[in-house]
Amino acid sequence: MSDIPFTLDQLRILKAIASEGSFKRAADTLYVSQPAVSLQVQNLEKQLSVPLFDRGGRKAQLTEAGHLLLNYGEKIITLCQETCRAIEDLQNLQGGTLIVGASQTTGTYLLPRMIGMFRQQYPDVTVQLQVHSTRRTAWGVANGQVDLAIIGGEVPAELQETLTVLPYAEDELALILPVLHPLAQAETIQKEDLYKLKFISLDSQSTIRKVIDKVLSQGEIDTKRLKIEMELNSIEAIKNAVQSGLGAAFVSTTAIEKELEMNVLHIAPIKNVEIRRVLSVIINPNRYRSKASAAFIREVLPQFSTHPDALDPERLFANPYSSNNGDRQGDGKDGKGSIEIDSVT
């Protein structure tokens, strides 16, 4: 097997089938016909002389050889993408791509403003914003699928030695009430008042929920006594429910700026209790860092930093393979952007 027995297209097809769980959905994702996908897999299996899928069940299941090829295939695809981006930087071509990851609240309310500022300075750079759970976002950075990310939770333990994690900003979490709620008239509310409220919350596994429970417990508030009447899967749904008078909720203050201006929600300070969490910037120091990501780190991140121990951008450029040049890439006005949103955090 001296020649390489597969192509990048075949690796992309394998990855799509593994992700989608079926040949048909993979074909739809790749905008090709199902017979074309099946033929490529058959050719690949013939070249490798091993089956890559168990075809007995309703869902396409990878064999041991399939898992092995998928593992290396994802690395090959990522390295090819990094190579193309490095060559773009070397030739100083117009354009380029910046891929930013974020957990839900950060990605929904903070990152669009940051990306807007970046696009004003670099309109020809394509920006992709991927909004997922903290865990999935961290793995995206580790695997080289995301240039950098801003998260509100903790990096998974298994990645803490792989990624560089630096404090970036403080995010204040506030108790919100309907504007006509009786407690909305008080300057502050007592801890005991919390036990009388009906709460609307994200699910118990969300990052914000865990932070709130931890801080309230530190403030000698028994979170088990709080009445969770409803669990929703997005901050927007929670805000709408509170506006409709269905209960109270804890949300990031960055998520309710518009509602406060319109006077449709009320923040109720809790006496002697402040709820804050630290937002962190994460990068993979062992991956190539493009000029676009270097410019974003140096020029945009400091404009929004609020943490007392906030990052020094130069600490993110220790890797000799990173791009230390944040020069402007192109001066066109046809920049593109995309947003990918997944699960709650």
Curated annotation (Swiss-Prot):
The keyword DNA-binding applies. InterPro entries: LysR_subst-bd, Tscrpt_reg_HTH_LysR, WH-like_DNA-bd_sf, WH_DNA-bd_sf. Residues 6-63 form the HTH lysR-type domain. Keywords: DNA-binding, Transcription, Transcription regulation. Residues 23-42 bind DNA. One of its GO terms (biological process) is regulation of DNA-templated transcription. Disulfide bonds: none annotated. GO terms for molecular function: DNA-binding transcription factor activity; transcription cis-regulatory region binding. Gene3D superfamilies: 3.40.190.290, Winged helix-like DNA-binding domain superfamily/Winged helix DNA-binding domain. Residues 311-345 are annotated as: Disordered. Belongs to the LysR transcriptional regulatory family. This is Probable RuBisCO transcriptional regulator. It comes from Synechocystis sp. (strain ATCC 27184 / PCC 6803 / Kazusa). The lineage of its organism: Bacteria, Bacillati, Cyanobacteriota, Cyanophyceae, Synechococcales. The gene is rbcR.
